[in-house]
């Protein structure tokens, strides 16, 4: 993905997008099987960034609902009246330059329904279990 950094006091004073790269560790054993990442609207902030990175991995699938967003390296400041304000200071993007501040879409969208909740069934977990059973690679 990409990240921009604040460069001035103006509303749109940000750097050009800078690519962010992650490389796997080469000095230890790595998990080589499929992974299901479960999300919903309560997955936000650092989780949003984690989900965005996991979506780029060939053996990872994101299952559930769109994340709640809110990455972007939050900045906190105090206003002259004593109130604190917190906001994203560094817009973040996926590899296709889609802004992720407002959430990351799942690969497989699953909604929890009231009937399953009443029965104690977690539709997202059950979908992930089924996916992993069928993708044992």
Regions found by a protein language model. Give the residues of each.
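Short, well-structured beta-strand/strand-turn elements
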Residues: 44, 57-70
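Active-site-proximal beta-strand/loop segments in catalytic clefts of secreted hydrolases
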Residues: 6-7, 38-42, 64-67, 88-90
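Soluble non-cytosolic domains of exported or imported proteins
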Residues: 29, 41-45, 115-123
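Loop/turn elements at helix/coil->beta-strand transitions in domains of secreted/extracellular proteins
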Residues: 32-34, 58-61, 135
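Low-complexity, Gly/Ser/Thr/Pro-rich intrinsically disordered linker/tail segments
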Residues: 106-137
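Terminal peptide-recognition signature
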Residues: 35, 54, 97, 128
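Gly/Ser/Thr-rich loop/hinge elements
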Residues: 1-34, 72-76, 89-93, 99-100
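Stable alpha-helical elements in mature extracytoplasmic
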Residues: 46-50, 59, 120-128
């Amino acid at each position: 993905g990409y990240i921009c950094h604040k460069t001035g006091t103006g509303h749109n004073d940000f750097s050009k997008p800078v690519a962010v790269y992650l490389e796997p560790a080469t000095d230890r054993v790595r998990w080589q099987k499929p992974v299901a990442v479960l999300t919903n609207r309560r997955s936000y902030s650092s989780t949003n960034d984690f989900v965005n990175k996991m979506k780029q991995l060939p053996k990872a699938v994101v299952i559930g609902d769109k994340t709640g967003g809110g990455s972007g390296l939050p900045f906190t400041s105090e206003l002259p009246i004593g109130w604190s304000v917190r906001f994203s200071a560094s817009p973040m993007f996926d590899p296709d330059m889609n802004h992720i501040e407002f959430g990351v879409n799942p690969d497989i969208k699953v909604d929890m329904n009231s009937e399953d909740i009443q029965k104690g069934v977690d539709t997202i977990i059950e979908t992930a279990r089924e996916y992993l059973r069928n993708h044992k690679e």
